From Swiss-Prot:
The gene is gcvPA. InterPro entries: GcvPA, GDC-P_N, GDC_P, PyrdxlP-dep_Trfase, PyrdxlP-dep_Trfase_major, PyrdxlP-dep_Trfase_small. It comes from the Bacteria. This is Probable glycine dehydrogenase (decarboxylating) subunit 1. Keywords: Oxidoreductase. It is an enzyme of class 1 (oxidoreductase). Its EC number is 1.4.4.2. The glycine cleavage system is composed of four proteins: P, T, L and H. In this organism, the P 'protein' is a heterodimer of two subunits. Gene3D superfamilies: Aspartate Aminotransferase, domain 1, Type I PLP-dependent aspartate aminotransferase-like (Major domain). One of its GO terms (biological process) is glycine decarboxylation via glycine cleavage system. One of its GO terms (molecular function) is glycine dehydrogenase (decarboxylating) activity. The glycine cleavage system catalyzes the degradation of glycine. The P protein binds the alpha-amino group of glycine through its pyridoxal phosphate cofactor; CO(2) is released and the remaining methylamine moiety is then transferred to the lipoamide cofactor of the H protein. Belongs to the GcvP family. N-terminal subunit subfamily.
Amino acid sequence: MPYVPHSPEEIREMLDVIGVNSVEDLFAEIPAELRPKSFNLPKGKSEMAVLQQLDKMAAKNTTDLTSFLGAGFYDHFIPTAVDALSSRSEFYTAYTPYQPESSQGTLQAIFEYQTAMARLMDMDYANASVYDGGSALYEATLMAVRKTRRRKIIVSEALNPIYRVMLDSYTTNLNLELVTVPHNHGRTNVKSITAAVDKDTAAVIVQNPNFFGSVNDFTEMFAAVHEHKALAIMSTYPVMQSVLKTPGQMGADIAVADGQSIGQPLSFGGPYLGIMTCSKALVRQMPGRIAGRTEDEDGKTGYVLTIQAREQHIRRQKATSNICSNQALCALRTLIHLCLLGEEGLNRTAVLSVERAHYAAERLTAIDGVEMFTKGPFGNEFAVTLPVNAFEVIDKLTERGIIPGFPVGRYYEGLENVLLVACTEKTTEEQIGIFAEILRGTI
């Protein structure tokens, strides 16, 4: 909307209508000690001057760096059609579709998104999304606690540390017992997790690929978890589901993910969306909205919000969660992106990303002193141990136009020399070669 300041004449007219002499008189009831003395702000500027100032500030951003950052958020290519379709006003300005008779387009889009997510994860049901991957994991944890009526949660240390911090924060006052099982050189410690499960365990939480990029098959572990009547929760990377064994195939009860990698640009932490899917037995424990397909009395297909007794606008205190909105626009972008790619396109995206990562691992470990930290199979992300501090390497390479990866030591004490490197289909062999040569000359 245009930036239109009030003229002195307009201010005078409004004050006259209100019946006060000045702006100061308007706020006279506020005690002097509570009024701001000065904000030290310059006088207001015109729209043109504001835009010029913002352009000058934006010019300080560096956008031509080659990035190998991952750690849960990935720079995949987004077709132009995603922006074009998702920015249509019918979607962009739509509100929560409480009135199905006037919201069929929005409801069908949500239904199609749910269908796509359930197929992608090989699970029975999906909701209309939550805020992000971390909140999806938290909600999955609460689902397990409600279903099992137990309070012990076993968490792999190889789970994204941002998610673990969020889980700790969200559950601080819920009297849950969070048991963290150490990783094994970047791999999820399946034996230790299985051994930790007992009659008091509500759920086991693992990630595949995990934070270090390591890939596991949890089928046997999940079977052991189920023997104790506990639930298996898996956090995933959506793009990789086309080349890996899915959560459903492994026997997961709840599968969650951050949907950023499909349709959402990297943008200072958001907005993204949390993907939530579950088995049929848990659908009534699912938080957030669920769109369903039905028929009206004339036999015409219609879409509605269903199983609403779970939601706060129906039962408030007894609701499965108090989420007041979802990320419907982000979910739409994910749906559009998936539809544009198709199964073959998504698979090709994943294969290219994995191939580039394995080529990068080969080039980097050919450098003296650089060794693989991630042991065993990995996807499009891996960790290497450097002979020097990873933070220092990142600073030096960034000055040369390359962000070499994520410093694992930020979240894992004792791993200050470990660098987490990610590749996507956008990463070229030329970029990898330049990265390797600059790194060789730096360390």
